[in-house]
Design a protein with these regions (language model features):
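Small beta-barrel nucleic-acid-binding modules, primarily SNase/OB-fold domains
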Residues: 2-167
């Protein structure tokens, strides 16, 4: 009886280890996949031949929400850059919503950086640890690009917008 319990536990742990290895097999290496949907300015769906459909949140940045000023512009810029294209994904982690958080490259351009540098996303200070992204935001602000081009009120960061809207 005891050996049967031990055997069952051993099989369970072996299965658990295999599932963990499968889940982590796409990290930290890069993979190539097709963008099948741009959800908003910082979230896309990719289709990978081996791993299927992957929901990806762009690391280190936060783009305006869809119903926020510049939300549709940010989404459309991202669609224009990588919509239906084969991109390279460097997986950083998986967030609490089970999305892959990563850096996307297209034709040797880092898309995360590009969006911030052109003023279509904020550096997400809460999660960012790359000076390159913070510097990109500072340059976009100085040059009054995208979200920083308004002469009126300062733009509301997406994390404050979500808090204000109760999301």
């Amino acid at each position: 009886m005891i050996s049967k319990i031990i055997k069952t536990c051993l099989i369970f742990f072996i299965c658990l280890i295999n599932v963990h290895c499968l889940a982590s097999s796409i990290t930290p290496d890069k993979l190539h996949a097709k963008v099948i949907k741009v959800v908003d300015g910082d979230t896309v769906y990719l289709k990978h031949k081996e791993f299927g459909k992957l929901k990806v949140r762009l690391a280190d940045i936060d783009a305006p929400e869809k119903n926020q000023p510049y939300g549709s512009e940010s989404t459309n810029i991202l669609k224009g850059l990588i919509g239906q294209k084969i991109v390279e994904l460097k997986k950083i982690t998986v967030d609490r919503y089970k999305r892959i958080v990563g850096i996307i490259y297209y034709e040797n351009t880092e898309i995360n950086y590009y969006l911030v540098r052109k003023g279509y996303a904020w550096c997400y200070d809460r999660y960012n640890n790359r000076l390159k992204i913070k510097n990109a935001e500072n340059l976009a602000r100085q040059e009054k690009l995208g979200i920083w081009s308004s002469q009126g009120e300062a733009p509301i960061a997406p994390w404050n917008w979500r808090k204000k809207k109760g999301k």
